[in-house]
Amino acid sequence: MNIALLGFGVVGSGVYEWCRSREDLHVRRVLIRSDKPEIASIATRDFEEILHDNAIDVVAEVMGGLHPAYEYVTAALKAGKHVVTANKALIAAYYQELTALARQ
């Protein structure tokens, strides 16, 4: 399964390491704000690269906060991607909208 991570802070880097330990998961892209030499070959600052990459099965939002997480998650769902998040603020604010998008 090909995964894109949105964020590479404490949570994102931990999810990245966990995915690397699994043979069935492949982190294809990581959306970053600042340079991360350890993931330079898969890092991007352009969310559109993730959105339009048909090989990406799942987008994992690990950035936290409401914005731009909301915009990224809704765009990914509208593009037909599966989305995983543990962002409590995002879910609390937009639960009904996000679940409706996910069901489409």
Task: Map each language-model feature to its residues.
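Glycine-rich adenosine-cofactor-binding loop
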Residues: 2-17
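Gly/Ala-rich phosphate-binding loop of Rossmann-like dinucleotide-binding domains
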Residues: 16, 20, 77
